Swiss-Prot record:
Protein family: Belongs to the RbfA family.
Subunit composition and interactions: Monomer. Binds 30S ribosomal subunits, but not 50S ribosomal subunits or 70S ribosomes.
GO molecular function, one term: ribosomal small subunit binding
Pfam families: RBFA
Role description: One of several proteins that assist in the late maturation steps of the functional core of the 30S ribosomal subunit. Associates with free 30S ribosomal subunits (but not with 30S subunits that are part of 70S ribosomes or polysomes). Required for efficient processing of 16S rRNA. May interact with the 5'-terminal helix region of 16S rRNA.
Gene3D superfamilies per record: 3.30.300.20
Protein name (database record): Ribosome-binding factor A
Example GO biological process: maturation of SSU-rRNA
Keyword terms: Cytoplasm, Ribosome biogenesis
A single Gene Ontology CC term: cytosol
Keyword Cytoplasm: yes
Cellular compartment(s): Cytoplasm
C-alpha cells in the first residue's frame, strides 16, 4: 500500500522535475505515465511516453539516463524517504497497444456490410 502512495507522489514530482528542471533538448515532449515502486521502496520503474518516432524515444531515454542522478536527488529533496529509490526508465507500450487495438476494431466495423 505504501509503495503505491510513494509511486503516485513520485509520478507527480517526476512530471514537474522533467518538464521544469531538465534542460536537455533530447528529452523533448515526454510524459510520465506510471511509476511502480518495489515493496521495499528500493527500485522505482518509471514508465514514460514520448511523442515522436523511435529515434526520439531513444534520444529521450539517453537524456533521462544522463540526468538520472540529478532527478534522483530532486526526488530525495521533495519526498521524505529514508532512501530514495533507484530509478529505472522504461517506455510505456500500453498506449501504442491501445491505439493499435482501437484501429483494428475500427477497421472491423468499417469492413462490416451494413444490415
Amino acid at each position: 500500500m505504501r509503495a503505491n502512495r510513494v509511486g503516485e507522489q513520485m509520478k507527480k514530482e517526476l512530471g514537474d522535475i522533467i518538464s521544469r528542471k531538465l534542460k536537455d533538448p533530447r528529452i523533448g515532449f515526454l510524459t510520465v505515465t506510471d511509476v511502480r515502486v518495489s515493496g521495499d521502496l528500493q527500485i522505482a520503474k518509471v514508465y514514460i511516453s514520448v511523442l515522436g518516432g523511435e529515434k526520439k524515444k531513444e534520444e529521450a531515454l539517453k537524456g533521462l539516463e544522463k540526468a538520472k542522478g540529478f532527478i534522483r536527488s530532486e526526488i530525495g529533496s521533495r519526498i521524505r524517504l529514508r532512501k530514495t529509490p533507484e530509478l529505472e526508465f522504461e517506455f510505456d507500450e500500453s498506449i501504442e497497444y491501445g491505439n493499435r487495438i482501437e484501429t483494428l476494431i475500427h477497421e472491423l466495423h468499417s469492413d462490416k456490410p451494413s444490415e
